[in-house]
Amino acid sequence: MKHIPSSRELGYTIIRIALGIVLVVSGYNKLSYALTQNTEHLIQIGSTMGLFGFSSGYLWWGYLAAFTEFFGGIAYILEFLVRLVSLPLICLFIVAIKFHIQKGDPFSVWGFAFICLSICIGVLIAGKGDDKKLEEMK
């Protein structure tokens, strides 16, 4: 019997894929700029880990953030290990939010990271969505 997605399942899928696209583009932009221009931007991104007591390895942290966005986005789009991938993405957005709040930025600056964090938490809870095999058994 062919599975017809519910409107809830379809809505969840659209939100997950949309965030995945945003993450892939954002991560790709960071990586391509670092590979073609210079790595200063990644060092700046990585330096936010100083808020958590890290005093070195900023370039490594910057690359880790960019790779997390890029490959996390691909995983969200392909619906591959979404719960596992959500954990580093949640950490990434917590760091971003803490950075902007500590800088004194208004919600309009860090609100997007808050939305992304909320979606990642939702994906962590929901996983891939409805289990089609269980639905077929009912």
What are these regions (language model features)?
Residues 32-57:
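Membrane-interface interhelical connector segments
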